[in-house]
Structure formats: structure tokens, C-alpha cells
């Protein structure tokens, strides 16, 4: 790709130099805000995600504000105004309705919808958009239309917008196809990993062990000397975190939510913080997560995700996270893999059937049944699983890294093209 023949200063930090014939105007010159309130009974409810704007899933959690939504028309650009939904935006391909937290932009006749989808979803614009927001709490802020409309954009003539959108459609489609291929590989690796876990925690390691009927059709036979117990008899504590959200702070104690349980343990990278006072209150309420406990997500899209707390970090949990403390005669690692296995995951799935929002209660969780071998056998099984899945997890890390590089490459191409740093066509 080549550069344009001549450039000029845009006068805008996030844009830098732009092609000489491009115009710099405020966003309000290219869009008007659509503020028509409608009901989701009249207009299909839409979800605004990082991947774009889509029809709302039937089982998504609904609010009581179905009659208090914003109208969206085909070709409108919609963006979530809150920083914790950063990047959730896109052009809608249909009429519908969105929640009031979103800003709906109707393009004027000086900007194309397909071009605006790339421009306003570019990394540089998104950063500029949220930079103009105002704080709700320490780590959460929102950007209103009054602030958004003042952001300056650099826009080429309509014909050039069309060429840019066409070029990016082709370029990003190739990258997306490569990402999909890598994701397929990860799915296959995860499937292989799950097979290893499932077999080990239901059949054991001795192929010559005497077997008995488990009494459950989808589990089949299990080693004769294994016990079938309910989870409440395998853990000395099964509790969840706080049912109210404390004020977050810039410094303080980690406050674990469902997004912080990463499938192996706790990822503290983006963990919210709370004050010492709130921390002490929640510890007294039984919301502290201790080293050696297994964390299980019990609410939301990642319900069923499991991680073992192996660190000494003092932290408390939200109600979306259950904390399970293994009894002293049990292997923490084995029980973590048991909770990851289809024995428990199938029961989680069944308990959520027909629910508007993915969720399991502590009462149901405590009464899930599971298979329990003797402690020494638990340790052998856990060590075997660790050994067998290690190369699989390494392959997943490498493939995930390749996906990240492809996503980064995609964003670089979009940013370079929509800000005029390179010329297409």
C-alpha cells in the first residue's frame, strides 16, 4: 500500500497528519443522534457487542425496561456509552431497539454507513471516545452524546469512502478467516483436553479395575471401589460471595467477579479493588476466597467455569462466584478437574434449562452428585491429567498468541486506512 501524494496537519492529536483533500469536522457534522423511545414489543430488541449489533438472544437476561428503549434504524451506528463495555458498537443491519445506555447515530448524507463502521470501530477512535467520558465511579465512566458530538473526524469524499470500505471488507475477511481457522484448532485442542479429563475422573487409571454400574446412563460404569457422593459431602464449605456491589477504588483489596475466574485460577490483571473497610466487612460476612479453595462461576455467560486458588492474595468474591473448600482427605487438584468434567458440567447445564439467565443456586450445587476415588488415587489421577494436558495447553497458548497477532494486524490495517496513513485503490 502506498501513501497519498500530499498531507496536511489535522490539528487533532489522535488523527495526526491526513491527506490534503480530506475534511476535518466535528462528529455532529456527519451524524445526528436518534433519540426516539420505543418498546421492544414494537421493535426487535438488539444487543450491542464487540462483534457488532445483533438480535438479542432469547435466553439473555431481560430488564423491566422493555417499554423504555431507543429506536435503531438500518444503517445507524450504535455504541455503548459505558467504559466497561468498551468497543461494543457497530452499524445495525436492521431496524430494532436498544437499551438507553447506548448512543444511536443516524448518518447524514456526507458519510457512508459502511465507512463509518470501520472509522468508529477503529482502535484510535474508541480510545478517543472513552477519553471524553465522565466518571461514574473510580474505574467506570460513561461518554454522553454531548461529549461525543465534539470529537473531530477526518473524512474523505463519498467515492473514496466506498473504496476504503470495499478494501477493508476484503482485507478483514481474509484475516477473520485465518482467525476462525486458528479458533477451530483451539476448539479441537480443548475437546481433546476435555476427553482426557472426563475419562480420568470417571474411569480411573487402572484398565483392569473391577467396574460397577454408576446408576447414571450417561456416565456408565465406574470403578467398583469409588463412592458416589453429593458435593455437600465432599467439601467443608460451599458458599458464594457478596450479594451487593461495594464501591470500587483505585487501590485496595481485589474483588473477584466471574470474569476474573480464568479456568485455571484467578486472573488479577483487571480485578476491581475495594477499600479496607469494605473488605473487612465482607470477610466477616464469609465472602473471602482462601488458598486451596475451588472457585466456580454460578451466574452469567461463563457459568460452570472453574479455577483453583493457588495464591495467598487476600481477596473477596461477588455472588456470581461460588467458593468450594475441599475436605482435608481430598486432593484439591482432583476436585478441580472433577468440577470441570462432564459429570458436573452436565448437571449444571440441566439445572439451567429454561432459565432466562444462566444461573445455578447453591442449593442445587450442593446436591450435585459426583464420583470420589480414595485420596491416593485422586492424587495419581490429578497428576496424570496435568501431565497429559500440559502439551495441549501449550499448543493452545501458542495458537491464542497467533490469534492475538492477527487481531492486532487487523486493527493496524483499519487504523492506517481510515485515518489516511495509507492509500487504497
Predicted regions: what they are:
Residues 6-10, 82, 96-103, 136-162, ...:
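A short glycine-rich beta-alpha junction/loop motif
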Amino acid at each position: 500500500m502506498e501513501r497519498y501524494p500530499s498531507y496536511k496537519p489535522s490539528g487533532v492529536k489522535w488523527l495526526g497528519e491526513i491527506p490534503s483533500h480530506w475534511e476535518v469536522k466535528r462528529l455532529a457534522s456527519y451524524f445526528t443522534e436518534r433519540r426516539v423511545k420505543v418498546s421492544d414489543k414494537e421493535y426487535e430488541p438488539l444487543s450491542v457487542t464487540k462483534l457488532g449489533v445483533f438480535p438479542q438472544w432469547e435466553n439473555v437476561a431481560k430488564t423491566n425496561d422493555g417499554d423504555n428503549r431507543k429506536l435503531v434504524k438500518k444503517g445507524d451506528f450504535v455504541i455503548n456509552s459505558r467504559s466497561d463495555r468498551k468497543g461494543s458498537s457497530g452499524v445495525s443491519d436492521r431496524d430494532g431497539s436498544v437499551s438507553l445506555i447506548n448512543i444511536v447515530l443516524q448518518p447524514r448524507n456526507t458519510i457512508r454507513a459502511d465507512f463509518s463502521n470501520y472509522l468508529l470501530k477503529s482502535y484510535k477512535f474508541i480510545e478517543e471516545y472513552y477519553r471524553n467520558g465522565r466518571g461514574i465511579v473510580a474505574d467506570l465512566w460513561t461518554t454522553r452524546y454531548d461529549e461525543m458530538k465534539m470529537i473531530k473526524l477526518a473524512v474523505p469524499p463519498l467515492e473514496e469512502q466506498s473504496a476504503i470500505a470495499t478494501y477493508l471488507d476484503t482485507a478483514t475477511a481474509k484475516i477473520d478467516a485465518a482467525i476462525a481457522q486458528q479458533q477451530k484448532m483451539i476448539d479441537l485442542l480443548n475437546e481433546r483436553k476435555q476427553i482426557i479429563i472426563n475419562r480420568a475422573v470417571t474411569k480411573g487409571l487402572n484398565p483392569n479395575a473391577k467396574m460397577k454400574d454408576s446408576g447414571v446412563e450417561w456416565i456408565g460404569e465406574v470403578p467398583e471401589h469409588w463412592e458416589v457422593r453429593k458435593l455437600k459431602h465432599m467439601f467443608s464449605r460451599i458458599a458464594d460471595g457478596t450479594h451487593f456491589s461495594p464501591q470500587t477504588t483505585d487501590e485496595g483489596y481485589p474483588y473477584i467477579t466471574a470474569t476474573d475466574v480464568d479456568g485455571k485460577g484467578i486472573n488479577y490483571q483487571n480485578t476491581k479493588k475495594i477499600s479496607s473497610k469494605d473488605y473487612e466487612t465482607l470477610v466477616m460476612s464469609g465472602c473471602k476466597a482462601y488458598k486451596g479453595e475451588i472457585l466456580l462461576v454460578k451466574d452469567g455467560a461463563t457459568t460452570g467455569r472453574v479455577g483453583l486458588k493457588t495464591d495467598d492474595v487476600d481477596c473477596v468474591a461477588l455472588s456470581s462466584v461460588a467458593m468450594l473448600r475441599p475436605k482435608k482427605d481430598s486432593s484439591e487438584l482432583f476436585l478441580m478437574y472433577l468440577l470441570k468434567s462432564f459429570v458436573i458440567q452436565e448437571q449444571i447445564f440441566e439445572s439451567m434449562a429454561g432459565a432466562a439467565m444462566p444461573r445455578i443456586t447453591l442449593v442445587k450445587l450442593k446436591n450435585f452428585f459426583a464420583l470420589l476415588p480414595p485420596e491416593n488415587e485422586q492424587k495419581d489421577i490429578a497428576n496424570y491429567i496435568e501431565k497429559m494436558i500440559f502439551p495441549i495447553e501449550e499448543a493452545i497458548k501458542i495458537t491464542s498468541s497467533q490469534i492475538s497477532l492477527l487481531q492486532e494486524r487487523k486493527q493496524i490495517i483499519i487504523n492506517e486506512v481510515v485515518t489516511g496513513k495509507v492509500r487504497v485503490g
